[in-house]
């Protein structure tokens, strides 16, 4: 898996940068983007479509979901309409807006290929049920919005699957419902809280279902209870 990010700005840019990405503005001057876009940044500069620029403050980040919330001080900012990613269906058309390779405010389109994808990339896939699309995503698109045809943000473009390092038709976006839950916790609580079962589980595949005498594979198998957690023997009744 590759994370689409831009390591250097194009030569004609005035300001030298070590990372280049996209984002979108929510109400109350908050901005959402990917964590890997602002990771280790000493200064974050926001450039709008009307060419205004602002220095943004990082309100908080959540590396496990690859999300970051920024804030700028201005009362005249264009905001997006937030949609409901749960209402997306496979085959729906979606549109991405971002700055691939520093080509600002580029638009690409495609369809939702799958929902609830789990990918193994720096453990992010363990916490995010990704939307898979065939929208063209390249370095610089990270953190940018994925819109439905009603103009509502339904995802945050985050990752690609590639053997060459470039777009190959497999792009992954964080569902906006997941992103907004993370953002609300960062803004209101300063951190993200997650539930913890204290057990190791594995997915029940066809082979395991046969071994357990199941008619078809479904559910999960609890393999072990972790030490020093609230779970203990006899806690689970089967």
Where are these regions (language model features)?
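Single conserved hydrophobic/aromatic residue that forms the stacking wall/gate
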Residues: 228-238
């Amino acid at each position: 898996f590759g994370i689409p990010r831009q390591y250097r700005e194009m030569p004609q840019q005035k300001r030298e940068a070590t990372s280049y990405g996209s984002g979108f503005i929510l109400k109350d001057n908050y901005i959402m983007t990917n964590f890997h876009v602002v990771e280790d940044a000493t200064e974050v500069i926001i450039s709008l479509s009307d060419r205004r620029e602002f220095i943004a403050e990082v309100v908080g980040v959540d590396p496990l979901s690859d999300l970051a919330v920024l804030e700028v001080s201005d009362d005249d900012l264009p905001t997006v309409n937030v949609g409901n990613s749960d209402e997306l269906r496979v085959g729906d058309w979606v549109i991405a807006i971002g700055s691939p390779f520093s080509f600002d405010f580029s638009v690409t389109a495609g369809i939702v290929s799958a929902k609830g994808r789990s990918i193994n990339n720096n453990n992010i896939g363990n916490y995010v049920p990704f939307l898979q699309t065939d929208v063209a995503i390249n370095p610089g698109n990270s953190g940018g919005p994925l819109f439905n045809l009603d103009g509502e943000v339904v995802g945050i473009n985050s990752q690609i699957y590639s053997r060459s390092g470039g777009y190959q038709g497999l792009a992954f976006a964080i569902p906006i419902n997941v992103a907004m839950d993370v953002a609300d916790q960062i803004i209101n609580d300063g951190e993200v809280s997650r539930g913890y079962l204290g057990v190791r589980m594995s997915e029940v595949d066809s082979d395991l279902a046969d071994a357990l005498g199941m008619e078809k594979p479904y559910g999960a198998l609890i393999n072990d209870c972790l030490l020093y957690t609230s779970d203990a023997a006899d806690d689970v009744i089967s």
